[in-house]
UniProtKB/Swiss-Prot annotation:
Annotated CRAL-TRIO domain residues: 93-260
GO biological process: intermembrane phospholipid transfer; phospholipid transport
GO molecular function, one term: phosphatidylinositol transfer activity
InterPro entries: CRAL-TRIO_dom (IPR001251), CRAL-TRIO_dom_sf (IPR036865), CRAL/TRIO_N_dom (IPR011074), CRAL/TRIO_N_dom_sf (IPR036273), PITP/CRAL-TRIO (IPR052432)
Source superkingdom: Eukaryota
Name of this chain's protein: CRAL-TRIO domain-containing protein C365.01
Pfam families on file: CRAL_TRIO, CRAL_TRIO_N
Residues spanning the signal sequence: none
Residue intervals passing through the bilayer: none
GO terms for cellular component: cell division site; cell tip; cytosol; nucleus
């Protein structure tokens, strides 16, 4: 597991101390069906990588103000339960609106020259929701995609930390504009998945770029200034400076044909998880969350004492066991397209050489 940078150790400890105090308040607990479901949501939010790196993402998003960062993470834990993310992931792709899935509005493919996974946003394929049902189904698609994106953010493999967002404006037109959904997307992205974006490239030229710039003049204010600072506008010919040609779509003069992506993948199969499997898994999540909290408090109290190093190593080893337990939950779900293509193995290792 990752080591906390020496200059961030104290603020990470302060962040955990504040968060633990907050989530143990009766007023917070009552936001969940039960205290056990709180622990499950906490575990699923934080254990996908290294607990401390998860907290650091929230700290960085709030400029290392502990109270603001703790509140942000606490809100994300509540949101995760209220958004029924478990249900979305258990249903898998087949539980989503298939018109949205096959439209290839949002998908992950390849890595850039810094080793970051590439998240493609094909705005010309965006289908604006026509009613409340469409909006909810589109939200479910985005949440499903974002949860799968976390599989590519393992700090043991993704030393670059974050993804490259590649926004394709090749055939972008007025029919693809929906500022209401843009606001929903921005709020979800930056409030509940902070610091996942390493850089974003807006790729286009001519009239289509001019059209998008008009939208951007309004939409950019949905984003925090820190997120806006990561956005770069470029022409299709410049993308090769960031990404190898084999991962660049045909529309940007590359070799990757995204229209064939789902044709290559075997059909989705049902997940192996039964209700009783998830009940047992949740018990393990609850126990693990409680043990992480206990060990972290012990680590905080041991600061500067002879036993500090020993407790730190014990806690580090436990964080790794938690990551393996989190992957156990992933294995119960229907396999996503990247798993079906053999790009992600059972241990969570990503191998783009198989693309």
């Amino acid at each position: 597991m990752a080591d906390i940078p020496a200059d961030r150790k104290k603020i990470v400890q302060e962040g955990w101390s504040r968060l633990f105090s907050d989530i143990e308040q009766p007023s917070y607990i009552q936001k969940f069906p039960s205290q056990e479901s709180l622990y499950v949501s906490f575990f699923e939010q934080c254990a996908f990588d290294d607990f401390d790196l998860t907290l650091l993402r929230f700290l960085k998003a709030r400029k290392f103000v502990v109270t603001d960062s703790s509140d942000m993470l606490a809100n994300a834990i509540v949101w995760r339960q209220q958004a029924n993310l478990r249900s979305i992931m258990v249903r898998g792709e087949n539980g989503l609106n298939q018109n949205f899935v096959k439209a290839s509005m949002y998908f992950i493919w390849g890595q850039d020259k810094k080793g970051r996974a590439i998240v493609f946003l094909n705005l010309h394929n965006f289908i604006p929701p026509k009613n409340t049902k469409d909006m909810e189904e589109l939200k479910a698609l985005i949440l499903y995609a974002m949860e799968n994106a976390r599989l590519f953010l393992d700090s043991e493999q993704n030393a670059a930390k974050g993804v490259l967002g590649l926004v394709d404006l090749t055939y972008f037109s007025r029919k693809n504009i929906d500022l209401d959904f843009a606001r929903v997307f921005a709020e979800t992205f930056q409030n509940y998945y902070p610091e996942i974006l390493g850089q974003a490239l807006i790729v286009g030229s001519g009239f289509r770029m001019a059209l998008f710039e008009g939208v951007w003049s309004i939409g950019k204010y949905f984003l925090d200034p820190e997120v806006r600072s990561k956005v770069t506008f470029c022409k299709p010919a410049q993308v090769s400076g960031y990404v190898d040609s084999k991962y660049i779509p045909l529309s940007m003069h590359g070799q990757f044909d995204e229209t064939k992506l789902y044709e290559r993948a075997p059909p989705e199969t049902a997940g192996i998880g039964k209700p009783e499997n998830y009940e047992e898994l949740d018990k393990e999540y609850v126990d693990a969350a409680k043990e992480f909290i206990r060990l972290t408090r012990e680590w905080i109290y041991a600061a500067g004492k002879p036993q500090e190093a020993e407790i730190e190593e014990k806690r580090k080893a436990f964080k790794y066991e938690c990551k393996k337990l989190w992957r156990k939950g992933v294995a119960l779900r229907p396999p996503n397209i990247y798993q079906r293509l053999g790009l992600i193995d059972a241990n969570g290792h990503v191998d783009w050489s198989k693309a």
